[in-house]
Amino acid sequence: MEEARELANYLPFSFKTSKEEEYIEFLWDAFQTNYTHGKYQFAFLAYHMLTMSFIYFNIWQIKQTEPTDFGKGLIGFGKEVEKNLQDATSPFVFSTVNERTILRFLKLIACDNTKIGTYAKLVDDRNETAHPNGNIFFSTQAALDTKITEILRVVEEIQTHSMPIIQSCYSRFLVEGNNPEDREYPDDADQIREVLIHENYLSQKDIEICSAFDVLQHETHHNFPGIESLHQTLCTNYAKQ
């Protein structure tokens, strides 16, 4: 159970809406309740949904940070689906696409076909588990714990591939939001929470990438003190507990 909680560090630190937060909390509760009561097959289903949510949040970050690349990833979809994804206002809109298909967006962060094939196997496991086929694939805690270890390896791998996206997202945030006079929120903490974390669904792991960002890249910016102030506020307010 303790290892399984590691996934929380890859999910959004906080949410823009209470509905989204309640949904993720519901999935965690479903996982924990079924795990505790030995219903490991159902615990796996809830954990898989949390994992797919993580993938949706990563794809959302691509959409927000590299919209041109995201648009290229839409090639091959039907016009209606393409428009739906292009106009998406929430990462959960990606759930309208077949899970195996949505994984192809991970090519945009340099995940090759071999890796995506491995990730797709997790979707196949979910499909086998969710259908009434007379089989209990996860009948023991050991079996589920082994699968959780495998899932977390995949999550960490995807997170590593996402690093350039997070760095680009944060760099742009610092450049565009360093002036309290012409940004969305005059207070640094509010700007970070609402515009950086909520709009991009940043996780604790993402925030760690931001904290390690070298702000000296922007030392020639006319408002470098404002950039330093934003960065220091992030590091102070979101230091890993």
Predicted regions span which residues?
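Acidic, Ser/Thr-rich low-complexity intrinsically disordered segments
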Residues: F173-Q232
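Amphipathic alpha-helical interface elements
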Residues: M1-L103, K121, T160-D182, H221-K240
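General structural signal for secondary-structure boundaries
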Residues: V97-T101, I109-D112, F137-Q141, L196-I209
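Charge-enriched, short contiguous segments at helix-coil
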Residues: S18, F105-R172
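Short flexible/disordered coil segments
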Residues: R126-N135, E194-L202, Q232-Q241
